[in-house]
Amino acid sequence: MIQVLLVTLCLAAFPYQGSSIILDSGNVNDYEVVYPRKVTALPKGAVQPKYEDTMQYEFKVNGEPVVLHLEKNKGLFSEDYSETHYSPDGREITTYPSIEDHCYYRGRIQNDADSTASISACNGLKGHFKLQGEMYLIEPLKLPDSEAHAVYKYENIEKEDEAPKMCGVTQTNWKSDEPIKKASQLVVTPEEQRYLNTKKYIELVIVADNVMVKKYTSNSTAIRTRIYACVNTLNLIYRAFNIYIALIGLEIWSNRDLINVQSASSVTLDLFGTWRETVLLRHKRHDNAQLLTGINFDGDTVGLAYVGSMCDPKRSAGIIQDHNKLDVMVAIAMAHELGHDLGINHDGNQCNCGGNPCIMSATLNFEPVYRFSDCSRDEHWRYLIDNRPPCILNKPSITDIVSPPVCGNYFVEVGEECDCGLPAHCQNPCCDAATCKLRPETQCEDGECCEQCQFTRAGTECRAARSECDIAESCTGQSAECPTDDFQRNGQPCLNNNGYCYNGTCPILTNQCISFFGSSATVAPDVCFDFNLQGQGNFYCRRERARIFPCAPQDKKCGRLFCVKGPIGNTISCQSTSSQSDLDIGMVDLGTKCGDGRVCNSNRQCVDVNTAY
């Protein structure tokens, strides 16, 4: 028998106050004081945990009763979540804190289908919720021996800086109506639809730089709390794409920065990506890393990321300026940059997300936004279908979730066969939401080889070959998962011996020129590649931090790519391309044939194909 325990904190709700008040979010001109009433349902005789898996609070907003339903974000941290900081003498200190009973929740408002909530219950209720299409914030009032909270609209916060905030990614906007038309008519095969429907998981590392440490007066608890709140909101936003984000690591550069963090965002992103590839990945497994910095980037830029780079060792990264007192605004900037990593471009004027500003607008708006546009959805789907980033299909092991298992949190944990959320939210006919067990006569609930709750017939293609260097995978008939992506051996000749296979592709100079300059483009004469011997400007083979290194004569076709657009006349026109936001754009792809029996390796050297792999 379940006994309902009503814990009444206070039934009063005071009207809006006449004077302004200074809260954590800034100076608020119009607010309401409420005393939330907590309703707890526990079995008779049960011991109440510090932070329950589900909670319900009642209070009034604008004189109307509001019921806030909360459920703990159980997948917020991975089992091997770690925190790294540095001693005054520079020693790395890594700990694995126990965070099973954390206090971060997502939720909704009762009887409001479009509502959302992201709340920290660590010390009172702090966070934000969407009610009847409007964004409200809630936080405890710092009064002794009081449970009073302030509730206020985002629009009632005095803005310290009215300048528009920008994403530093350039040249990604829709150029005309035509791409939008194509995106809205995206047609997928049944195999591709199964892939799109499959849950995706991103294991995230966040790095706080030394300026952040100074900004928060070396208070690691304050930094940790801010980042946890951001990731909690990030999860809420990406649920629309069936993507679940687990924080696997937090690194705080407490002693000094480990890269040269500077106001030039493109340089900082390049340095951070290189550090991620050469340092972070070697001691911490993860899918994506974001740098949260206290420095002010040049102009109005508050974030930058590579586009279409998820799972790439260097480029699966982004940088975010800690530009706003509100956690939610920083989280939205992080969601925007992560969207670029997931292949999403900036929205054009004809992109729509229901009349509100959208996540992928090039200008970060003055109000919190949660929705991706129709353009973003189709752009993301196209990226997934074309690139199949492998790391986001790695389901966390059922033992990898930090918190004790709970049915209804969307993560399959010990003792569960499926988890489609709470019964009121579950839309999966294969799963019994009340027990987190598969329904009778069903074999699966999700996966590229799961169709109508049954394993797909053996031999059914679940991942098509993307090139002659790739291998198609087929369902086994014994599992809901598509077998591991495999491809032809590296170094195998391809495209009529014009190239050699490399990680499932056949990179050749001609196709790289066409991708940059159009179908009439061809590879430039050898004399153009002599620019790479100079080691100046954009013409080089290797780059380490701020230094660039010229190509050796035998390696010149492994540096900057040179092309000719259109027929070659009497005058040689050497064309190349580069990008401030991604310094690797315009370089010859790794694995490209640079001579008979020779390919470009990771050091941009032209080496024997038999020894390269």
Curated annotation (Swiss-Prot):
Query: Could you say which enzyme class this protein belongs to?
Result: hydrolase
Extract one GO BP annotation from the record.
proteolysis
Annotated Zn(2+) binding sites: 336, 340, 346
Q: Which GO terms describe its cellular component?
A: extracellular region; plasma membrane
Q: Could you say which residues bind Ca(2+) 2 here?
A: 406, 409, 411, 413, 416, 419
- Residues forming the Peptidase M12B domain are 200-396
Q: How does it assemble?
A: Monomer.
Name listed for the protein in its UniProt record: Zinc metalloproteinase-disintegrin-like VMP-III
Source organism (scientific name): Agkistrodon piscivorus leucostoma (Western cottonmouth)
